[in-house]
Curated annotation (Swiss-Prot):
Similarity comment: Belongs to the universal ribosomal protein uL2 family.
Keywords in alphabetical order: Chloroplast, Plastid, Ribonucleoprotein, Ribosomal protein
Keyword Ribosomal protein belongs to the record: yes
Location(s), subcellular: Plastid, Chloroplast
Family matches, as HAMAP family: Ribosomal_uL2_B
Name of encoding gene: rpl2-A
Subunit structure: Part of the 50S ribosomal subunit.
Database matches in PANTHER family: LARGE RIBOSOMAL SUBUNIT PROTEIN UL2M, RIBOSOMAL PROTEIN L2
GO terms for biological process, alphabetical: mitochondrial translation
Main localization category: plastid
Name of protein: Large ribosomal subunit protein uL2cz/uL2cy
Annotated organism of origin: Arabis hirsuta (Hairy rock-cress)
GO MF entry, a single one: transferase activity
Length: 274
């Protein structure tokens, strides 16, 4: 990713950075509109997720997470920006004339060929079942349910590692540090998701954040007591508690929020590290 730094000609361009190489020119038959209503509200209009709202209108790109065009070679034609995710996407022209979007693998360039199937080479961008991959393979876009499509390791720079295969299951180490079991018949894509340096890009001003649909975040210590448990006091007062809490009074640090009786509890060998 080529980072272009703005010239400091105005305060709004100071410290700003954008990617100068990736543009957005989607195909009409692979996009459709979205009805964004609420922006963090429920059906009653009450805020259920804070710090969301506004933002520029978006068109959703249909991404092929299933990679079910088996044994048909495709060629990367474009690498495009997708406003619905922080990873880039690339347009694939398959040999049978079909065109699809997939997540852009790191290092893939225009003109590269990819393929999905059971007996395909272990090459960046190829999709195949876990049972056909050697141990230590770096993968992304991993299926949890066979045939449902990739659900794990899809963010920019995400990569998981195949560390073991035993019986009907394969053991994966996910980007979060979690180690879990997945069926060996599930498929994944070889390589790492592109746009690794997305966290190095500086938006430069508050308005750029608003375009993404993210509203300002206010600290609880500067609120009134009616709005937050940390609020109140004269001047720059401390929070008045031994440990910080959420706006609803729950512990803010270290509290586990995962359901204890979730179906995948027995499949997780080691919980994610912070």
């Amino acid at each position: 990713m080529a980072i272009h730094l703005y010239k400091t000609s105005t305060p709004s361009t100071r410290n700003g950075a954008v990617d100068s190489q990736v543009k957005s020119n989607p195909r009409n038959n692979l996009i459709y509109g979205q009805h964004h209503c609420g922006k963090g509200r429920n059906a009653r209009g009450i805020i259920t997720v804070r710090h969301r709202g506004g933002g520029h209108k978006r068109l959703y790109r249909k991404i092929d997470f299933r990679r079910n065009a088996k044994d048909i070679y495709g060629r990367i034609v474009t690498i495009e920006y997708d406003p619905n995710r922080n990873a880039y996407i690339c347009l694939i022209h398959y040999g049978d004339g079909e065109k699809r979007y997939i997540l852009h693998p790191r290092g893939a360039i225009i003109g590269d060929t990819i393929v999905s199937g059971t007996e395909v080479p272990i090459k960046m961008g190829n999709a195949l079942p876990l049972t056909d991959m050697p141990l230590g393979t770096a993968i992304h876009n991993i299926e949890i349910t066979l045939g449902k499509g990739g659900q794990l390791a899809r963010a920019a720079g995400a990569v998981a590692k195949l560390i073991a295969k035993e019986g009907k299951s394969a053991t994966l180490k996910l980007p979060s540090g979690e180690v879990r079991l997945i069926s060996k018949n599930c498929s994944a894509t070889v390589g790492q998701v592109g746009n690794v340096g997305v966290n190095q890009k500086s938006l430069g001003r508050a308005g750029s954040k608003c375009w993404l649909g993210k509203r300002p975040v206010v600290r609880g210590v500067v609120m009134n007591p009616v709005d937050h448990p940390h609020g109140g006091g004269e001047g720059r007062a401390p929070i008045g508690r031994k440990k910080p809490v959420t706006p609803w009074g729950y512990p803010a640090l270290g509290r586990r929020t995962r359901k204890r009786k979730k179906y995948s509890e027995t499949l997780i060998l080691r919980r994610r590290s912070k």
